Amino acid sequence: MRMFGCNSETGLIPRLGKRGAFAPLILLAAVAINGCAIAESAREISPGALPARILFVGNSFTYYNNSLHKHFRKLTWASGLFTPENSWSRIMTISGGHLPEHAGGFENVLSSEHWDVVVMQGHSLGPISEGTAEPFRKAARRFAAISRKRGTRPVFFMTWAYTGKPEMTVQLDQAYTDIGRELDAQVVPVGLAFATVTAERPDIPLRIDDGRHPSLAGTYLAACTFFAALYDQSPEGLPYDAGLGNDTALYLQQVAWQTVQDYANR
């Protein structure tokens, strides 16, 4: 998927991703959201109990490393739960974007077709900074209500602490857990998985040199955590390793599964 725009969560340039040629629907959606990025995967979806149509809404924390949703769907294909023909995922991202900035496009994209799940990722500081925390919560409430009205399940993407700022883990955990409980919405504890790997295996860098954005291993860990949370199944042993090697991939798979279980049992 080609990307256009700046590679920074702090930038303001929108990005547009694609897989193959644009379909008219993608063009219309891209115009409708006025600068948000959309990436497309497979089109024909078979009905089923497990979520097959998933929209990821966020910023560069989502689209780095050729996009979280691509690694996630490769895990689902490797598991045998879905194939490219019966699963569909997209991203809607704004570089440097806070969750409220998606207000212009969220409902348009959600109404363009049926989604089983919409994943919402706030700015890395948005839920925990004075001046942005309440707008984050207001947007979360509004977007969750819009989602449910259209039969889509809202899910929140708990992000991770910056390098050298471990206190962010607790702050983000509390912020996302609180909004998840308030709205009775699932929270995927990616940030807690990051904290575990950072403590146990500092030889596996999860962030790039800026200390914020995910490395390939970080994006893969996030994808494994989403797989574990959304499907309530362990990703351990899945053959897709994103080029990280079997040993590293297996460790990240194990951490993802354990983190999701521990978080659910708190």
Model-derived features: where do they sit?
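Conserved SGNH/GDSL esterase-like catalytic core that processes O-acyl groups on lipids
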Residues: 53-57, 62-137
